[in-house]
Design a protein with these regions (language model features):
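Long, charged/polar, soluble alpha-helical segments
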Residues: 2-105
């Protein structure tokens, strides 16, 4: 049936989204969201194997993928914000060195 193909596709996409979020350090920067995504993926996988719940599996997998995508984006945002702060600190340090005459020859 078509819903079985949908479930397989949605489950694969959800697994991929969870993997991408994990690679983006979501466990560190968005632990609640990645946990929710993993839990949702497990529920979708169980539903896919249960005759009575099988039709719900695609929607459950979509939700898990959305949670994983959000976890990945939040993690990437935290990483970029940290890098930006590091660069600002470097600029401030260089400005202080220039204004105090350090490193002049």
């Amino acid at each position: 049936p078509a819903w079985a193909q949908d479930a397989a596709l949605e489950l694969a996409q959800a697994r991929q989204a969870v993997d991408k979020a994990t690679q983006a350090d979501a466990d560190q920067y968005a632990p609640d969201l990645i946990g929710l995504a993993r839990q949702g993926l497990e529920q979708a996988q169980r539903a896919a194997g249960d005759r009575r719940e099988r039709k719900n599996a695609p929607a459950m997998a979509l939700r898990a993928a959305a949670d994983a995508d959000l976890a990945r984006v939040r993690s990437e945002e935290a990483t970029v914000t940290a890098q930006l702060q590091l660069r600002r600190n470097e600029v401030n340090q260089l400005q202080r060195q220039l204004s105090t005459g350090e490193d002049r020859r």
